[in-house]
Swiss-Prot record:
Protein name stated in the entry: tRNA modification GTPase MnmE
GO biological process: tRNA methylation; tRNA wobble uridine modification
Enzyme class name: hydrolase
Residues holding GTP: 225-230, 244-250, 269-272
Designated gene of the protein: mnmE
Disulfide bonds: none
Function: Exhibits a very high intrinsic GTPase hydrolysis rate. Involved in the addition of a carboxymethylaminomethyl (cmnm) group at the wobble position (U34) of certain tRNAs, forming tRNA-cmnm(5)s(2)U34.
TrmE-type G domain sequence ranges: 215-364
UniProt-listed Pfam families: MMR_HSR1, MnmE_helical, TrmE_N
Organism: Chlamydia abortus (strain DSM 27085 / S26/3)
Cofactors required: K(+)
Gene Ontology MF term list: GTP binding; GTPase activity; metal ion binding
Cofactor note: Binds 1 potassium ion per subunit.
Amino acid sequence: MIKNDTIAAIATPPGEGSIAIVRISGPEAIQITDKIFSGSVPSFSSHTAHLGTVSYNGQQIDQTLLLIMRAPRSFTGEDVVELQCHGGYFSCSQILAALIAEGARPALPGEFSQRAFLNGKIDLIQAEAIQNIIAADNLDAFHIAQNHFQGHFSKKVQQISSLIIESLAFIEVLADFPEEEQPDMQEPMNRLHEAILIIDDLIASFDQGQRLAQGTSIVLAGHPNAGKSSLLNALTNKNRAIVTDIPGTTRDILEENWMLQGKRIRLIDSAGQRETHNPIEQEGIERAIAAMEASEAILWVMDASQPPPPLPEILMRKPSLLLWNKSDLATPPHLETTLPQLAVSAKTGAGMIELKQFIQQWMQKQQLGKNGKVFLISSRHHTILQHMRTYLLSAQEGLQSQSPPEFIALELRQALQTTGNLSGSEINETILGEIFSRFCIGK
């Protein structure tokens, strides 16, 4: 990548909209923009806005609002100019073409963020968080990405790095002065133990972070013809599942994404639980059981007009709600259990507001104590931390067995390098290019 030229790109999504933004960054950003803008751009103070027109070859393209951010007080750390024009395809495209004709280069995907990283404005963790913020399709994913972008994950990595450096300095003194009396090894042991605890906490957050980012899984389960598929359709406002009076219609797992107050829920319809000699239906029942085991919560659906069937043991092990569906046909019977119960009707909508409120309250309880916590969602981060942990455990064992300090120092240096792989201070350009190539153009 050429790092000293000036790049330009449209920073807003294509299509109709009230405004579009063209972004320019680099050493010639101000001079190039001055060639097409009606005002004297070099005279503008940093972080000011100016209304004017953009023209090229004697023809006015559009009225624009120009924002100028001089280096180093900009996102990229370079001189940056943004031109806000009317939305749509033609205005921003012609402005971009004029900038390129005057000497700017079309930006590569993620190149603005890559320049911000290379100029020390953000680290690699924060750069990756930008992409995750853009891609977030629910509030949990958005909050996790924002947490990373605000530097909370980076602070954890810096803390680990400091503990490793302190331990390494201690060990290197031993290697340099072997004739001296062996000092107490408890100090580096304590530092390594603290670093490993931080790493373990981060690694342990990965599964939960993935679940939060991908959505909470809730299974609709119960006996045949209780109305599970009807409830799926009613909750999602879609005719997603086939609904008939024939028992055993649902034979496979059916998953639908459902947004509730910004939270993503993976709502799963499953085959009715009963004894059957049909091998296809039996396969569906086994898949339903597996889905319940893998889920985070179960909505156990029962027919209010029928005698209550026995409850499966799994309902006592998982967060579960008993739903008496078809409450428009009959008053639900009394069931002696500690599990919460709710009468609903997928047909009339009765109880559906209460059901949504129950799910929302349950999800809020799951979030208690998680605000501000760092969650991993990247497999890259998870893998690097596992390698880091291996190196530190090896160094810790070396200290305990009084291995040669050179061996321990080698393990610590490798662990330190992995912290650089996370932050980007120790990573090759090929991997960097691969990471930033996933970004959109203009970011």
